[in-house]
Curated annotation (Swiss-Prot):
One of its GO terms (cellular component) is Golgi membrane. Pfam families: Glyco_transf_17. InterPro entries: Glyco_trans_17. Residues 24-538 are lumenal. It comes from the Eukaryota. This is Beta-1,4-mannosyl-glycoprotein 4-beta-N-acetylglucosaminyltransferase. The keyword Metal-binding does not apply. Changing residue 137 to P: In strain: 129/SvJ. It is involved in the regulation of the biosynthesis and biological function of glycoprotein oligosaccharides. Catalyzes the addition of N-acetylglucosamine in beta 1-4 linkage to the beta-linked mannose of the trimannosyl core of N-linked sugar chains, called bisecting N-acetylglucosamine (GlcNAc). It is one of the most important enzymes involved in the regulation of the biosynthesis of glycoprotein oligosaccharides. The addition of this bisecting GlcNAc residue alters not only the composition, but also the conformation of the N-glycan. It comes from Mus musculus. Interacts with MGAT4D. Pathway: Protein modification; protein glycosylation.
Length: 538
């Protein structure tokens, strides 16, 4: 009798374990692409995977009598930092809070036939019926026209519309996508279409855009910072920029970015900049440079997020090095769509000294997640996000269980489709010199410790040949400024201003090389010209 009870008890235990395993397996399957027919069985099941709207931090409500937020002519709907008196503007820049605005831009339009189309990615929003060509609505890339018949995407979509106009609806509602855009609503860029995202079948436009926070540590990469502001200025809602009066090596340095922020250099974007000031150097950072490197990102994240107001848990947080610039289209997708997993990375085009030395492959940088995950899993520590260790964090299982999301890291772009740019050591020779002497004491060998490596003529020779400080030479593939994703658009539009980043300033002139070829001797080239060309090629 006892044996029978034990057997019955064991059978119930095994059945329970099988049921739990099956449920977990089914939950995992929900993040793997499967037939649309199965997905369409339960719209409520799909919607349960999207974010809730509870704030991750307490929302700041304005106190009675507070002054209105300042606004600028360029961005009339975006708040500047809290107004300060002129005498305290520079003193308290690193103490003011930043109120995240709501993005009211009309990214999507609804056609008369009921379709929902992404304006910048759509050529034709509605098929005209015979004899009524006047109703044909077209939106070219970058168009900002808004007619009275176009309604903003600010209302609740039906389940059928949120599933991308599938089934029979596709027969009479159609968005014709421009090159580089995909999906039923033409809002999925190429860098997502050809990515390893496992949930492409679940992508749906959001009712309300997320806000995007981009956090950066700055040393002296001011040209690249200017490029970042122009590339992402209309899709990022807050640039959190950390400035310090110490270099990564622990030496004093002037607050150049703070000066540029207050003297009008970045006036066009100042209303979107949250200034973070690190006024100390971490203990032990001089002996172990990685302590300083990690602490910079930790302080940037914690101080910056603590001063952001009106945050929502589904807002996007992206932390970059100053020489890493994500492409606009990928960031805009994260802002406007539901259904992608986290954390996410970017496949970036790699360059050295300038965009003219294109390195093979891509740099895959894990740099983003939602604010909810940043707080719950990473503990508001940006360096943990960068290290791909979400599965070792003690709270990541609790986060999965609470949100119902399986954490699956993915990358925007691919080795063949760049989703950004990583331009390493992209300075003038003087800028490279400053980077050498400012570098942390942890990435050995520390080339700034060698006097010959700091010589400006030696640095110019490295830029000319594409060589490295250890004397090695690499065979880089040819790069042409006309190729796709050669450099951010703002650089190409201001070619003369940034010529030193787009063309090799120390490349041997073509006239000299051609003249040398014409004066070749019986051995193929004269000794003098051979010496010059060998130096150029070496």
């Amino acid at each position: 009798m006892k044996m029978r009870r034990y057997k019955l008890f064991l059978m119930f235990c095994m059945a329970g374990l099988c049921l739990i395993s099956f449920l977990h397996f089914f939950k995992t399957l929900s993040y793997v692409t499967f037939p649309r027919e199965l997905a369409s069985l339960s719209p409520n099941l799909i919607s349960s995977f999207f974010w809730n709207n509870a704030p991750v931090t307490p929302q700041a409500s304005p106190e009675p009598g507070d002054p209105d937020l300042l606004r600028t002519p360029l961005y009339s709907h975006s708040p500047l930092l809290q107004p300060l008196s002129p005498s305290k503007a520079t003193e308290e820049l690193h103490r003011v809070d930043f109120v995240l605005p709501e993005d009211t831009t009309e990214y999507f339009v609804r056609t008369k036939a009921g379709g929902v189309c992404f304006k910048p990615g759509t050529r034709m929003l509605e098929k005209p019926s015979p004899g009524r060509t006047e109703e044909k609505t077209e939106v070219s890339e970058g168009s900002s026209a808004r007619g009275p018949a176009r309604r903003p995407m600010r209302h609740v979509l039906s389940s059928r519309e949120r599933l991308g106009s599938r089934g029979t609806r596709r027969k009479w509602v159609e968005c014709v996508c421009l090159p580089g855009w995909h999906g039923p609503s033409c809002g999925v860029p190429t860098v997502v279409q050809y990515s390893n995202l496992p949930t492409k079948e679940r992508l749906v436009p959001r009712e309300v855009p997320r806000r995007v926070i981009n956090a950066i540590n700055i040393n002296h990469e001011f040209d690249l910072l200017d490029v970042r502001f122009h590339e992402l200025g209309d899709v990022v809602d807050a640039f959190v920029v950390c400035d310090s009066n110490f270099t990564a090596y622990g030496e004093p340095r002037p607050l150049k970015f703070r000066e540029m922020l207050t003297n009008g250099t970045f006036e066009y974007i100042r209303h979107k900049v949250l200034y973070v000031f690190l006024d100390h150097f971490p203990p032990g950072g001089r002996q172990d440079g990685w302590i300083a490197d990690d602490y910079l990102r930790t302080f940037l994240t914690q101080d910056g997020v603590s001063r952001l107001r009106n945050l929502r848990p589904d807002d996007v947080f992206i932390i970059d090095d100053a020489d890493e610039i994500p492409a606009r289209d990928g960031v805009l997708f994260l802002k406007l769509y539901d259904g992608w997993t986290e954390p996410f990375a970017f496949h970036m085009r790699k360059s050295l000294y300038g965009f003219f030395w294109k390195q093979p492959g891509t740099l895959e940088v894990v740099s983003g997640c939602t604010m909810d995950m940043l707080q719950a899993v990473y503990g508001l520590d940006g360096i943990r996000l960068r290290r791909r260790q979400y599965y070792t964090m003690p709270n990541f299982r609790q986060y999965e269980n609470r949100t119902g999301h399986i954490l699956v890291q993915w990358s925007l772009g691919s080795p063949l489709h760049f989703a950004g740019w990583h331009c390493s050591w992209c300075f003038t020779p003087e800028g490279i010199y400053f980077k050498l002497v400012s570098a942390q004491n942890g990435d050995f060998p520390r080339w700034g410790d060698y006097e010959d490596k700091r010589d400006l003529n030696y640095i110019r020779s490295l830029i000319r040949t594409g060589g490295w400080f250890d004397g090695t030479q690499q065979e880089y593939p040819p790069a042409d400024p006309s190729e796709h994703m050669y450099a951010p658009k703002y650089l190409l539009k201001n070619y003369d201003q940034f010529r030193y980043l787009l063309e090799n300033p120390y490349r041997e002139p073509k006239s000299t090389v051609e003249g040398g070829r014409q004066n070749q001797g019986s051995d193929g080239r004269s000794s003098a010209v051979r010496g010059k060309l060998d130096t150029a090629e070496g």
